[in-house]
């Protein structure tokens, strides 16, 4: 089913999570086909913000875009403005692409929409490649019928002496528009929403802020080096964001999983600005399987209670998952895990499923992992000595040699990330092709290339 969430948590009218309602299936695992999976009712005691997990980021983006479209149409039917708070970056990009499609194919009008963007680097020319102003125009504003006067984006060119007054006017403009009906948010590795870095106060308003080093490191690739990333930005404050009537935070990808866990299951602390969403009566977090992987209901579902109570069982997948988790937690080899280790870490139920206790579990998991290790990444040739040409080797290949395509984001990622596998495939007779997804020419500044060319020219003359 399109845009179908895997699992969701709901919130009461006062913003505190209610117990999750099971929708069938197995909790604590992700759907391979996009169907709904209900989490444990006990997860609501751990997750302090309502969370919905979709089978893919594209499904999640379409669902959020549909919600925005419904808000716009509802407001238009009452001759009212829909006031949206917007975010930038790769996370909401899919939402904007879907909104553009709805405008072009289904006639969704943005004539009654007023927008306020969360933030902008400072200083920043609005036409620069890294400008959020340019981003919004390229991905949304230039493709819809929104009125130019209804677009509000922090000005990265305002002089330092005028920044305070600009921020004050930005706050007043939001209030004059009637406040934000819906605020879209992303989350950074530091837990920032907007550019509200660790330490931001709950009642902070739109202001100039100094960026955290982690934030600047994460933006380095966009600026061709960390040293080129602006050190400051203008951002809506936490208080400004929490003043919106509804908040929707999106996070996709495994690199967001750890900070999502802190924001959703941890306490409200200024060091994780996103945790303040726990105090909002109508906030939600939208995730894909990768970004939800660290949540208790997915990573350690046994911590929520008996597995059978929420449709789970101790099958091979969950047994391996638990043993690996325990080994990593205790920093012990799997074969050295003891009955006491399992007992003391909430895995008594798993222990009781094996007559030999920890020994049986350890051997089972160790052997399953051992089978995945091979010196033949493309599979071994079949055994020509057998009448059927088959082999009893678990790594035997039905097709040998293979035609292999390696997709590499940049011209060096293939050898850096999988050089050993690459050379094994070639040495073992497979036909290997590499598809580079960018030429790499934009990864180097023009002046750096010219400087190197000048050096080579002078060197050759000598």
What are these regions (language model features)?
Residues 112-114, 150, 246, 282-284, ...:
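Residues at the starts of beta-strands that form the adenosine-phosphate
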Residues 112-114, 118-150, 442-462:
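Glycine-rich phosphate-binding loop and adjoining beta1-alpha1-beta2 segment
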Residues 73-105:
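Glycine-rich N-terminal segment of FAD-binding domains in flavoprotein oxidoreductases
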Residues 112-119, 251, 284-289, 434-437:
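Short internal beta-strands
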Residues 342-462:
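Active-site rim/loop-helix segments in enzyme catalytic domains that contact anionic ligands
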Residues 2-48, 270, 274-348:
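SAM-dependent methyltransferases
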Residues 2-8, 30-83, 379, 383, ...:
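N-terminal glycine-/serine-/threonine-rich phosphate-binding loop
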Residues 55, 59-60, 73, 122-321:
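Conserved phosphate- and dinucleotide-binding cores of soluble alpha/beta proteins
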């Amino acid at each position: 089913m399109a845009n179908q969430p895997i699992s969701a948590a709901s919130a009461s009218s006062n913003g505190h999570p209610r117990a999750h309602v099971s929708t069938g299936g197995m909790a604590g695992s992700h759907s391979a086909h996009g169907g709904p999976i209900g989490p444990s009712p006990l997860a609501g005691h751990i997750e302090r913000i309502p969370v919905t997990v979709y089978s893919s980021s594209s499904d999640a983006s379409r669902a959020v875009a549909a919600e925005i479209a419904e808000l716009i149409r509802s407001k238009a039917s009452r001759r009212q403005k829909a006031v949206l708070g917007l975010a930038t970056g790769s996370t909401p990009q899919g939402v904007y692409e879907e909104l553009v499609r709805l405008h072009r194919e289904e006639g969704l009008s943005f004539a009654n929409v007023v927008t306020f963007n969360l933030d902008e680097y400072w200083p920043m020319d609005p036409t620069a490649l890294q400008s959020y102003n340019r981003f919004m125009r390229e991905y949304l504003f230039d493709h819809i019928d929104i009125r130019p006067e209804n677009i509000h984006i922090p000005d990265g060119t305002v002089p330092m002496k005028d920044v305070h007054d600009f921020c004050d006017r930005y706050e007043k403009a939001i209030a004059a528009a009637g406040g934000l009906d819906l605020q879209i948010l992303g989350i950074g590795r530091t837990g920032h929403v907007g550019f509200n870095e660790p330490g931001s106060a709950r009642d902070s308003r739109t202001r100039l802020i100094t960026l955290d080093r982690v934030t600047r490191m994460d933006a380095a690739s966009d600026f061709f080096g960390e040293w080129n990333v602006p050190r400051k930005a203008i951002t809506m404050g936490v208080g400004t964001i929490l003043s919106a009537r509804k908040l929707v935070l999106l996070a996709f990808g495994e690199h967001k999983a750890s900070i999502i866990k802190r924001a959703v299951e941890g306490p409200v602390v200024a060091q994780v600005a996103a945790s303040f969403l726990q105090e909002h009566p109508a906030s939600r977090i939208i995730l894909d399987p990768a970004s939800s992987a660290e949540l208790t209901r997915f990573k350690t579902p046994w911590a929520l209670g008996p597995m059978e109570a929420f449709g789970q069982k101790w099958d091979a997948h969950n047994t391996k998952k638990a043993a690996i988790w325990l080994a990593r937690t205790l920093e012990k080899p799997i074969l050295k895990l003891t009955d006491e280790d399992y007992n003391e870490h909430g895995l008594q139920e798993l222990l009781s499923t094996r007559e030999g206790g920890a020994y049986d579990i350890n051997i089972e998991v160790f052997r399953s992992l051992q089978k995945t290790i091979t010196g033949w990444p493309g599979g071994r040739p079949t055994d020509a000595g057998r009448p059927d040409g088959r082999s009893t080797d678990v790594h035997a290949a039905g097709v040998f040699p293979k035609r292999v395509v390696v997709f590499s984001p940049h011209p060096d990622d293939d050898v850096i990330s999988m050089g050993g596998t690459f050379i094994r495939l070639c040495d073992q007779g497979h036909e290997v092709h590499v598809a580079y997804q960018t030429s790499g020419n934009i990864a180097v500044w023009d002046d750096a290339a010219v400087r190197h060319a000048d050096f080579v020219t002078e060197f050759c003359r000598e």
